[in-house]
Swiss-Prot record:
Biological role: With CysN forms the ATP sulfurylase (ATPS) that catalyzes the adenylation of sulfate producing adenosine 5'-phosphosulfate (APS) and diphosphate, the first enzymatic step in sulfur assimilation pathway. APS synthesis involves the formation of a high-energy phosphoric-sulfuric acid anhydride bond driven by GTP hydrolysis by CysN coupled to ATP hydrolysis by CysD.
UniProt key word ATP-binding: yes
Example of a GO MF term: sulfate adenylyltransferase (ATP) activity
PANTHER family: SULFATE ADENYLYLTRANSFERASE SUBUNIT 2
Protein name: Sulfate adenylyltransferase subunit 2
Gene giving rise to this polypeptide: cysD
Organism field: Rhizobium johnstonii (strain DSM 114642 / LMG 32736 / 3841) (Rhizobium leguminosarum bv. viciae)
Keyword presence, Protease: no
Family of this protein: Belongs to the PAPS reductase family. CysD subfamily.
């Protein structure tokens, strides 16, 4: 096993930077405490890695929590086969740069049956390729705790979820059966077969995430920054038109414009926004006056009534 301890300032998450402001420092301390608590309480933790900005912050915090050692648990990417190509390139580069144990899982049933967002719709596609795929991967790895990057400010069902989110043996979540969390005391006692989803970023906001990225100089997928890109307008969203699998529907026209993404997922189900924000400073300034949630750009959040809570009850991220 090669020595994975960072030997450059660039790869050292603890390297000298300007001190964090008290608000961000408090959030960072809480997140690091949660990482260490879960690592100490559970036998087989794993970190869910979706390659987006929250995952990048989550990974940075995990590296800080256990520096100068390696991140002591694997990263799990549930791949649907429909991610932006820039996301996959960034994932592979990151795993190599930080010597991470990266597990990639694609639902074999979904792959064999050629389940796609175009042929089966967003609800069925997400259920099979994401929720079912995640349950398969967690069972295969016998993981009893999974770190996720969800934040309470994102969406209503996430707002009421605890930092330790307890799951049944079939990974289901019951929002009416959550344990109290007093201060920073977390009860990790589980029965055989049960598991926990742990959310170190629960109390962060989207602006907190971006300010922390700026303060800590955390690299991101370039899609978060505005650039002239091709797109088509479909179902009220601007869909990136770079993948040859995207076929134009009758009446659709391929356009070009300055766009970026506030959230990243599968490219056919993730809408861009018009933006001129090409730098971190410009992105933060744009977010400070935003009036809608970043999740407005996700088709899976509005494909049926109570969509996100229903998905989470069934085992979604």
């Amino acid at each position: 096993m090669p020595d994975s301890r960072p030997d450059t300032e660039l790869s050292n998450p603890q390297s000298a930077k300007a001190p964090l402001d008290p608000h961000l420092k408090a959030l960072e301390n809480e997140s690091i405490h949660i990482f260490r608590e879960v690592a100490a309480e559970f036998e087989r933790p794993v970190m869910l890695y979706s390659i987006g900005k929250d995952s990048s912050v989550l990974l940075h915090l995990a590296r800080k929590a256990f520096y100068p050692g390696r991140v002591p648990f694997p990263l799990l990417h549930v791949n649907t086969g429909w991610k932006f190509s820039e996301m996959i390139a960034f994932r592979d580069e990151t795993a190599k740069k930080y010597d991470l144990d990266l597990i990639e899982h694609i639902n074999p049933r979904g792959k064999a049956e050629n389940i796609t967002p175009f042929t089966h719709g967003s609800a069925a596609f997400t259920d099979i390729m994401k929720t079912e795929g995640l349950r398969q991967a967690l069972d295969a790895g016998q993981f009893d705790a999974a770190f996720g990057g969800a934040r309470r400010d994102e969406e209503a069902s996430r707002a009421k979820e605890r930092i330790y989110s307890f799951r049944t043996p079939d990974h289901r979540w019951d929002p009416r059966n959550q344990r109290p969390e007093l201060w920073n005391i977390y009860n990790g006692m589980i029965r055989k077969g049960e598991s926990v989803r742990a959310f170190p970023l629960s109390n962060w906001t989207e602006v907190d995430i971006w300010r922390y990225i700026q303060a800590e100089d955390i690299p991101l997928v370039p899609l978060y920054y505005a650039k002239k890109r091709p797109f088509v307008e479909r179902d009220g969203m601007m869909i990136l038109a770079e993948d040859p699998r995207l076929e134009l529907l009758p009446g659709e026209v391929r356009q070009e414009g300055m766009i970026r993404f506030r959230t990243l997922g599968d490219f056919p189900l993730t809408g861009a926004i018009r933006s001129q924000a090409t730098t971190l400073e410009e992105v933060i300034a744009e977010l400070e006056i935003a009036t809608v949630s970043e999740r407005q750009g996700r088709a899976i959040d509005r494909d049926q009534s109570g969509s996100m809570e229903k998905k989470k009850r069934e085992g979604y991220f």
